[in-house]
């Protein structure tokens, strides 16, 4: 009973995997225009839950180091805007107005260091989904067992019992390959803005 709740990354995995199943089921049943919208929203969601959350976590680590040494709101804001500029590179002009955006993100106050769970959980779900697409119904018992385990085992141990090595770059690459395939599918729709 004390370990029945799934750890944060696995909780994110369950919901994301279900969304992937729904998306996969709908993608062949919708119109071209609906597919453009759905794919655009999917890519936006992948960015927000993987990349943006990863950069939030990087910012949190840096900020906590700053706080330990004594810092100011201005210094934290500089760290945040540098983080945004690194995140977007030269693809987007990041206004200095965003320097204070960090102060409006409730996770930083209410659930510190939660944001990694979005990145981890989403990439884990994407990697598992890629396996599901390869293995089909043979994957289902493993997936149900992973969900049923809740928080009774550490994610790396639980997943290893089902043949998934989350310490392997190859495993995570499967999730990133899914993201890449969605971006390519979107580009193939010849959408111009």
Give, region by region, the residue ranges found by the protein language model.
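Post-HEXXH active-site segment of zinc metalloproteases
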Residues: 1-17
């Amino acid at each position: 009973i004390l370990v029945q709740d799934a750890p944060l990354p696995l909780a994110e995995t369950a919901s994301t995997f279900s969304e992937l199943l729904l998306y996969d089921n709908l993608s062949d049943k919708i119109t071209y225009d609906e597919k453009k919208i759905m794919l655009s929203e999917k890519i936006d969601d992948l960015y927000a839950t993987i990349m943006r959350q990863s950069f939030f976590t990087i910012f949190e680590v840096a900020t906590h180091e700053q706080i330990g040494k004594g810092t100011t709101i201005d210094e934290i804001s500089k760290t945040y805007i540098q983080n945004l500029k690194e995140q977007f590179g030269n693809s987007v002009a990041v206004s200095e107005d965003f320097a204070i955006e960090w102060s409006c993100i409730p996770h930083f106050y209410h659930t510190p260091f939660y944001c990694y769970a979005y990145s981890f959980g989403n990439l884990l779900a994407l990697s598992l989904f890629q396996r599901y697409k390869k293995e089909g119904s043979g994957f289902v018992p493993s997936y149900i067992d992973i969900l049923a385990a809740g928080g009774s085992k550490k994610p790396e141990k639980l997943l290893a019992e089902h043949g998934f090595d989350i310490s392997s770059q190859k495993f995570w690459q499967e999730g990133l390959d899914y993201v890449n395939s969605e971006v390519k599918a979107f580009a193939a729709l010849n959408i111009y803005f």
